[in-house]
Amino acid sequence: MSASDRNLMIAGGVFHPPEACVPSVTALLQEQGIETDVEEDVEAACQRLAQGGYRLLTISALRWRMDDPKYEAHRQRWALALSESARQAITGHLRAGGALLALHTASLCFDDWPQWSEILGGRWVWGQSGHAPFDQVEVRFDPAAPHRLTEGLTDFSCPDEVYERLWLAPDVQPLAHARNMRAKEGQPGDWAPVLWTRQWEGARVVYDALGHDAQSLDHPVHRQLIERAAAWALGRG
């Protein structure tokens, strides 16, 4: 197996156990010839990343400083301030030609590292961003933003969370929007951007804000979207 076929996936975190998403993501990537190693320990994962051998880094984790008092009960187990060596491992991976596939909670991660939102092209803003309860969501692809990721895909609906009011970098062009279909007293919520691509210092980056669990990740259209996202990030075909 060549390095181009290998993926390192960082998963897990409070309220988002890895078993909710890891099997779905690793299975669909394996079908594309991409073998995945999974780590829940972020620092250990970044040590592995720094050693090389991975072309794709997938973040499907929920790890941040947890400064808000309401997270006090979870802080000892789950709070994370990313070390300088871990930051260098991620940027080193990208500068060496590696790719990044960021899923769902990745926009909440590493809130003590400003460069992360620059790499990702967006971030969760505490006190501003939010989401309605997990429910049926409607996803629409933007015909005004054609891209290999979305070409020929049909709009779809599935159970998920829609992250609203994220900060987006000025140059980000969303490829899809979604809304919770019962967010406002049974009425649909606001449309929010949920998918975009980006290049950071030559590295290809994809962020897919959907994917709370297998009910979303196993939807046929969403599966195809993630397959294409990985292929595009790796520069395949």
Walk through the language-model features, giving the residues of each.
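Short, structured active-site "lid" loops
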Residues: 52-70
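Short beta-strand/turn micro-motifs composed of small residues
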Residues: 11, 104, 178
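A glycine-rich, often tryptophan-bearing local segment used as a flexible ligand/cofactor-contacting loop or short
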Residues: 64-152
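Solvent-exposed loop/turn segments at secondary-structure junctions
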Residues: 14-15, 43-44, 63-66, 106-110, ...
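Catalytic beta-strand/loop cores that center a nucleophilic Ser/Cys/Thr
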Residues: 29, 118, 122-201
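Aromatic-Pro/Gly-enriched surface loop or interdomain linker
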Residues: 1-55
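A glycine-centered loop/beta-turn motif at secondary-structure junctions
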Residues: 5-7, 31, 57, 167-237
